[in-house]
């Protein structure tokens, strides 16, 4: 099953050699969906269902009192949807501001990419990945494998949330104590998954350069690979240009 997931993912990673194309297409897809909603039309795609909650979130708060609350998948979806809606609100506001300043729509759109539409698109992507992963896991019969996959899903969700805790802290959507709980739960999940990681990596088989583990090469030649990296580094066997500074000179 994991192999099928990987094969399906690999061909969708880039488009025309540039991920920014996908980011901009995603932003346009979401804003078009919002326009339909604001006109009272039906939102055509289920992946945009979070737009039904697009509103002023200034008074909204999430209740996280203990670490087990962070294992609640519905709560994680709620938080990821909140983040996407908040970033969408900021993006729409920024876009409207640029247009009011007599910038053309094209220039206003480009000026709203960094920190706004790009962040919103990535947030939507992570929400979409979370929901797809969850729906697939729910089809699996209860087993140790399912438990591990759920832990990975929760870890993914919390890691995504942790990157934007400053955003979640706006208007006290989450408390400072909840931020500590998020970080602690990430550490607990990493500890719990430690014994399963070798099996997981064997199944997914990411390329060594993607994994980035200095001692975790897939061919098993740990020290040979490490030395090859050193020996192949540019200038490895050349005398450094500052050698004379350290060279002992006769007086």
In which residue ranges do the predicted regions lie?
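Flavin-dependent oxidoreductase catalytic core characteristic
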Residues: 1-251
């Amino acid at each position: 099953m994991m192999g099928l997931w990987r094969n399906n993912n690999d061909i969708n990673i880039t488009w025309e050699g540039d991920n920014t194309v996908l980011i901009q297409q995603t932003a346009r897809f979401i804003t078009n969906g919002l326009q339909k909603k604001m006109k009272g039309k039906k939102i055509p795609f289920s992946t945009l269902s979070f737009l039904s909650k697009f509103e002023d979130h200034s008074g909204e708060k999430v209740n996280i009192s203990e670490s087990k609350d962070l294992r609640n998948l519905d709560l994680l979806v709620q938080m990821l949807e909140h983040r996407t809606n908040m970033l969408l609100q900021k993006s729409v506001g920024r876009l409207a501001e640029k247009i009011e300043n007599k910038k053309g729509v094209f220039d206003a759109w480009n000026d709203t990419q960094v920190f706004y539409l790009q962040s919103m698109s990535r947030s939507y992507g992570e929400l979409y990945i979370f929901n797809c992963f969850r729906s697939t896991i729910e089809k699996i019969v209860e087993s140790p494998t399912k438990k591990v996959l759920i832990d990975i899903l929760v870890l993914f969700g919390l890691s995504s949330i942790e990157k934007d805790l400053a955003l979640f802290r706006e208007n006290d959507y989450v408390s400072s104590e909840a931020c500590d709980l998020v970080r602690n739960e990430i550490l607990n999940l990493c500890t719990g998954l430690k014994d399963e990681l070798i099996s997981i990596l064997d199944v997914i088989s990411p390329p060594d350069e993607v994994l980035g583990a200095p001692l975790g090469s897939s061919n098993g030649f740990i020290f040979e690979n490490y030395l090859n990296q050193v020996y192949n580094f540019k200038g490895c066997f050349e005398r450094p240009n500052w050698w004379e500074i350290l060279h002992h000179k006769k007086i």
